[in-house]
Amino acid sequence: LANGTAWAGAGNGYQIASMVKSGQNGVNRTVYAYAMSNGVADRNNILKFNFTASGNNFTLDANSAVGIAVSATEMASAEKTAKRDLNGDQVFGVNINASAVDAQGGLYKGTMLGKEFYIAGSGLRTGSTGSLARDLTGALVNADGTAWAPATGYSVASLVAERANNVVTG
């Protein structure tokens, strides 16, 4: 901590699941600790704690002192970048359903932190190793970034997309 005392851990019903280091040779060295809830019903609640190099130690950043809630998108991206299973779910990134919603159109369903996403892509599979970790690139999301889902009473049968400059436009 900034006052020189040792960090006591995530506390409040959370346990550290993993740690990732960034930066090298004393330049911009940062440690990110990911903590998951101990509650059975809340295993998908993840907090991130940021530590910055301070001499030979790492000091907890004030803005993450109580932990920063991690979204499904952030967790998937962090796992892909780190090439590791950071939340202890035995999956590298997004867990892609074995059966495509529409393989020909390129629509799949995936899960991250208990949230279901529709994902546009080709031949998507769950990453079986860190180097194959998949993030939520191609996910269908609402304007606020939350997972898009069809209205109650409807289901998705296929994906039809127009591509302009390799961007889905419709």
Predicted ranges, named:
Residues 1-170:
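Long, low-complexity, Gly/Thr
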